[in-house]
UniProtKB/Swiss-Prot annotation:
This is Homoserine O-acetyltransferase. One of its GO terms (molecular function) is homoserine O-acetyltransferase activity. It comes from Ruegeria pomeroyi (strain ATCC 700808 / DSM 15171 / DSS-3). InterPro entries: Class_I_gatase-like, HST_MetA, MetA_family. GO terms for cellular component: cytoplasm.
Length: 312
């Protein structure tokens, strides 16, 4: 089954050309099934790029997905056309009475700020609390994941001496997890951040389970069953050239930046980078969607009140 997105959303044509099954709202209305309703709270400045990256992953599953784009209510983006935001996005305050099977909260390039200094921090706290009554499963990504784990468990983010930047080897720490079906024992994931969460602080919270980790860049994917949440601090969703774009931007802007580790062939920025994480990206987000399908109530009014495991 395809992902349902507006026909005029830029991701629609991009994903159609890539062979991803997409359908318009008119086409979806003719199918007599309940799609999984997934929200994307997009905090990234490059809205269209981020929309497309996540739509690509959740649209590759055999289930019909209805993707809803959400923004913070008062925050005004400076890097995406206001016409795009008005046509495709709804403010959080407008959707807060609705229910979602899943919610992705993206990262944001504000990791140098204390959480309390973020202009929309108070409303984001409302979002986190809202997920416990209105969302069946929430996926916090990079800064979004660090913000969630801080909100629910008080775990801090720590500044690094230098940016963790490149493709780092990670280990599968819990092969029996339903989120890791099909995962190799070891693989690479793109990393691009100035902060980290420390494994010792995660281990001090008994209800948290580290699923993926790296000796070089620490914990990557954490399961929080009590809050029906996953936190990932790295970027499976990245396109093949996303790290290149970030590197070229900093070089052109005169910002000191190292060549991303283990990304370019022979670490040569003049050569085309190879995508070595795509299959695991599809596995992770496909497994997440599958787990939602297995456990979310058919009656959306019951979301936040019960879990209905179809495997029972």
């Amino acid at each position: 089954m395809p992902i349902k997105i507006p026909a005029h959303l830029p991701a629609y044509d991009i994903l159609t050309r890539e062979g991803v099954m997409v359908m318009s709202e008119d086409q979806a209305a003719r199918q007599d099934i309940r799609p999984l309703r997934i929200g994307l709270l997009n905090l990234m400045p490059k809205k269209i790029q981020t929309e497309t990256q996540f739509a690509r992953l959740i649209g590759a599953t055999p289930l019909q997905i209805e993707l809803s784009l959400i923004r913070m209510t008062e925050h005004q983006t400076k890097t995406t056309a206001s016409e795009h935001m008005e046509e495709f996005y709804r403010p959080f305050q407008e959707v807060r009475d609705e229910k979602f099977d899943g919610l992705i909260i993206t990262g944001a390039p504000i990791e140098h700020l204390e959480f309390s200094d973020v202009t929309y921090w108070d409303e984001l706290g409302e979002v986190f609390a809202w997920t416990q009554s209105n969302v069946h499963s929430t996926f916090g990504v990079c800064w979004g994941g660090m913000a969630m784990i801080n909100h629910f468990h008080g775990i801090r983010k720590h500044m690094l001496d230098h940016k963790a930047f490149g493709c780092f080897r990670h280990r599968n720490l819990d092969p029996a997890s339903p989120y890791l079906r099909g995962f190799s024992d070891d693989f690479v994931i793109p990393v691009s951040r100035w902060t980290e969460v420390k494994q010792a602080e995660v281990d001090a919270v008994p209800e948290l389970v580290t699923l993926l980790g790296s000796d070089e860049v620490g914990p990557c994917l954490i399961s929080d069953p009590g809050h029906r949440a996953l936190y990932i601090f790295n970027h499976f969703e990245y396109d093949s050239d996303t790290l290149k774009q970030e590197y070229d931007r900093d070089v052109e802007g005169g910002t000191a930046i190292n060549v991303p580790i283990n990304y370019y062939p022979d670490d040569d920025p003049s050569r085309k980078p190879l995508n070595r994480w795509r299959s695991h990206a599809h596995l992770l987000y496909g497994n997440w969607i599958s787990e939602i399908y297995e456990t979310t109530p058919y009656d959306m009014a019951r979301i936040g009140l019960e879990s209905t495991d179809l495997r029972g």
